Amino acid sequence: MKQVGNFVLFAFLLLFTFTSCERKSGRKDSTSMQQEQIYDYYVQVVGITDGDTFDGLTQDKIELRFRIYGIDAPEKKQAFSDKSKIYLSDLIYGKTVGIKVQKKRDGFGRPIVWVYTPEGKDVGAEMLRAGMAWHFIEYDKTQQYAELESQAKKNKTGLWNDNNPIPPWNYRKKNK
């Protein structure tokens, strides 16, 4: 009889463990949602370099620097660089984000990736929508990113509020 009681207790604890990932609203927490979404891998964001580059800790505890695909944020000495960096930090710092690899590495050895918040938002799109980066059309031809930049520009959002914002690729050429 004692074995039956132990089995029932074990089954109850097992059931409780698997159902505890559910919130009272019936929605799953972000960990459960992440497991259902399809990403190449997940990283814990541990550092923000600028508005398009961040450091992430893999599940194997390896720290890597990533470059966000499709956007180009102001360089460190450029106007609006601090605001762009802070905006990216507010979006992803300290969070576990989903990563889809676009290309193996850029010229600095960084993996170029699409990044998704725990809620599933495309971080590159969010940076463009907020006017915190340029659409990097040299490498990305998607209509969505072009439209987001155009809308931010039209609304004078973020860096587009400046009279003459200088794209980072022009800034880099000028300041080699």
Tell me what each language-model feature is.
Residues 2-176:
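Small beta-barrel nucleic-acid-binding modules, primarily SNase/OB-fold domains
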